[in-house]
Amino acid sequence: MIAAQDLRKTYGPTLVLDGVSFALARGQCLALLGPNGAGKTTLLRLLATLLRPTAGALQIAGVDALREPERVRPLLGVVAHGSYVYEDLTAGENLRFWETMRGGDASPARLAAALAQVELDAVAEERVRTFSAGMKRRLGLARVLLAEARLLLLDEPFTGLDRRGRKWVNEFLLAFKAGGGTAVVATHSFGGSLGVADRIGILGQGRLLLDRPAADLSPEELPRLYESLTEGAEATP
């Protein structure tokens, strides 16, 4: 579904990503761990075709995403940290606006179905400024459902959520994978990573220091391995 090869990104003299390579098949999830400034968000933006790499190659669904980004963007669902919702609109109005902007089907029945899938149908007419962090995250994921995305890119989906909220995101990702979706999740959550990921990646100083099957890592081993690999690593701006 997605293959990144030797992705590099520089800003002037600063090297942000240094030869990142990985591949995921349909229905797989990569959890990307790393300290603040490791390059996780930059990598997600490259995968979303929002940034161009300085060097490297990227294929999504067999398409050269760097040459033809417009062909792969309809396949992508991007939920950034903070979710980018419109606080003064209701949940339903947010979805209607997003679908109208992308030229999608903004019919009331379709919007209601998406809100029901993320358990927000009961608050469809409430303004988003009253929502918790978890509810805003779910609203962002409703956009993914409406867009019928096949590759989901999530930046810190567990941050600011309580245990119930983290469990809900895990269940959403498992269902997304079961339906054939592929996901890359940038996170600080060890537990969340092992709960949904097929592969665990650890990013440090712009390099992928580890890429291993999640099944090979225990809940006790992963934090120790993370600390040993990232200890003393300076954050990449």
Label every PLM stretch briefly.
Residues L33-P35:
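The feature captures the beta-strand-to-loop junction immediately N-terminal to the Walker
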Residues R96, T100, A106-V123:
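Conserved ABC ATPase "signature" region
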Residues L152-D155:
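Catalytic Walker B motif of ABC-type/P-loop ATPase nucleotide-binding domains
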Residues A48:
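Helix-to-loop junction immediately C-terminal to a conserved catalytic motif
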